[in-house]
Design a protein with these regions (language model features):
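Short pre-active-site segment immediately N-terminal to redox-active cysteine/selenocysteine motifs
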Residues: 32-39
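A generic local structural motif
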Residues: 16-18, 63-65, 120-123
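Surface-exposed amphipathic alpha-helices with a cationic face
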Residues: 93-109
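Extended interfacial segments that mediate partner engagement and assembly in macromolecular machines
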Residues: 66-72, 76, 82, 90-94, ...
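N-terminal [4Fe-4S]-dependent radical SAM core
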Residues: 2-32, 45-52, 171, 176
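P-loop/Walker A phosphate-binding loop and immediately adjacent motor/lid segment at beta-alpha junctions
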Residues: 87-98, 145-177
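Charged helix-capping and loop-helix junction motifs
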Residues: 58-62, 90-98, 122-126
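Core AdoMet radical
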Residues: 45-60, 72-87, 105-119, 129, ...
């Protein structure tokens, strides 16, 4: 069952990368959402903190994004921001992630300034998380910055296997070398 964005989405996005090799393993299609209230010091996406930044995620944009994801060259999807877990003004992000899983079954990675524990305690955020395969959680902390870390910026951030964590009811980390 296709669950499409109907009408006007309230969610804005800052950027789409058709082929991205920096935000996750292998070649990915990446969506940067707009809007974040964490205001992490030294945030590298300051312009994307405004919920007014960027363009609305329309039906046409959703279809274009999915066409990129369906490319045989694309291994998975990365969702960053802004803050994906603050996109609760409507269900546009949830619908997009659901379509990605239903139509492509490709791996979804999501970066959030919230911890896993904070996400699962909020029903709307948990519903989004249930569509995700890998979560990079926690706010960027400048005092814990480590440029040698893969896929994250500070040592407090974790790379979490979401499916195993939900099933086992405890955080299951992925060791990325």
């Amino acid at each position: 069952m296709k669950v499409k964005i109907k009408g006007n989405s309230k969610m804005k996005y800052a950027q789409i990368r058709k082929f991205d090799v920096t935000n996750g393993p292998k070649v990915r299609t990446t969506l940067f959402v707009s809007g974040c209230t964490h205001n992490c010091p030294q945030c590298f996406n300051k312009d994307q903190q405004s919920f007014e930044y960027g363009e609305f995620l329309t039906e046409e944009v959703e279809e274009q994004f999915l066409s990129y994801v369906k490319s045989p060259n694309v291994h998975g999807v990365s969702i960053l921001g802004g803050e994906p877990m603050q996109q609760l003004m409507d269900d546009s992000l949830l619908k997009l992630l659901t379509r990605i899983k239903e139509e492509t079954n490709k791996e979804i990675w999501l970066w959030s300034g919230y911890t896993y524990e904070e996400i699962i305690s909020n029903p709307k955020r948990k519903e989004i998380l249930e569509q995700v395969d890998v979560l990079i959680d926690g706010p960027f902390k400048a005092e814990m910055k480590n440029l040698s870390l893969k896929y994250r910026g500070s040592e407090n951030q974790r790379i979490i296997d979401v499916k195993k964590s939900l099933k086992e009811k405890k955080v299951v980390l992925i060791n990325v070398i």
